[in-house]
Design a protein with these regions (language model features):
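Extreme N-terminal starter segment of soluble prokaryotic enzymes
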Residues: 1-4
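Core catalytic region of metal-dependent phosphoesterases/phosphodiesterases
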Residues: 9, 17-114
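Catalytic metal-binding/acid-base residues of hydrolase active sites
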Residues: 10, 54-55, 86-87, 130, ...
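Residues at the N-termini of beta-strands
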Residues: 47, 177, 185-186
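Conserved catalytic scaffold of divalent metal-dependent phosphoesterases
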Residues: 67, 87-169, 173, 177
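A short beta-strand/loop micro-motif in the catalytic core of glycosyltransferases
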Residues: 79-80, 177-182
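A glycine-centered loop/beta-turn motif at secondary-structure junctions
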Residues: 189-194
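Conserved small/polar residues in nucleotide/adenosyl-binding loops
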Residues: 195-202
Length: 202
């Protein structure tokens, strides 16, 4: 299986707001994301995993449509995403009810849920933020289950105010790969299992 794991892209961010170069830097973030889509197409990846904060804020409908068009351009890649603390799913969020391309699955629930992709023999688990801060570990107790060969988990947080979790306990949950977001620093928390990602500077 081949997949790309990203998080904290923060589309819609305007770095250095008020300065002449701010708009250009904001567009550079979008272009970084487009490069990831092109990479997924070129490498024919099975999955694109997005572990929260694809957007810097509540996404505009036109922004969701632009992102969805990019996802639709890689129909052989299954895109699975969750919302993080910046783009959390508010009651009036455009995330709710959005008509994603056929190859896209958003795990909208604030509680852990699972999507099975039989043709890839893979199950992907995760949950989205429904508010800016989540003080409890909603992933505590989530375990891989079912008959799929591969089990992947999307997780966003890891500090005291954003779904605090214990890496050691997560390692015992039976997942083949845990794709983390929020840390803003790529790294390996547990070798061969628990990884953080930051796509903003790709």
């Amino acid at each position: 299986m081949r997949f790309i794991h990203i998080a904290d892209v923060h589309l819609g961010m305007q770095p250095d707001a008020g300065f002449p170069w701010s708009e250009e830097r904001g567009e550079a973030i979008w272009e970084s994301f487009r490069r990831i889509i092109r990479l997924a197409s070129r490498e024919k990846t099975d999955f694109l995993l997005i572990a929260g904060d694809l957007f810097q804020r509540q996404p505009l409908l036109r922004e969701l449509k632009e992102v969805n068009d990019l996802f639709a351009s890689i129909p052989e890649t299954i895109v699975v995403l969750i919302a993080g603390n910046h783009d959390y799913v508010k009651r009036e969020s455009f995330y709710r009810g959005f008509d994603w391309a056929d190859n896209v699955v958003m795990l909208l629930s604030p509680e852990p849920e699972c999507v099975e992709v039989p043709e890839k023999r893979t199950a992907v688990y995760g949950c989205s933020y429904d508010k800016k801060e989540i003080l409890e570990n909603r992933l505590d107790g989530v375990r891989q289950e079912g008959k799929m060969k591969y089990h992947l988990l999307l997780a966003h947080g890891g500090d005291a105010r954003h779904m605090p979790w214990n890496p050691g306990r997560m390692a015992q949950a039976g997942f083949d790969y845990i794709a983390c977001g929020h840390i803003h620093k790529p790294g390996i928390l547990i070798p061969c299992l628990l990884y953080t990602s930051d796509a903003a500077d790709e």
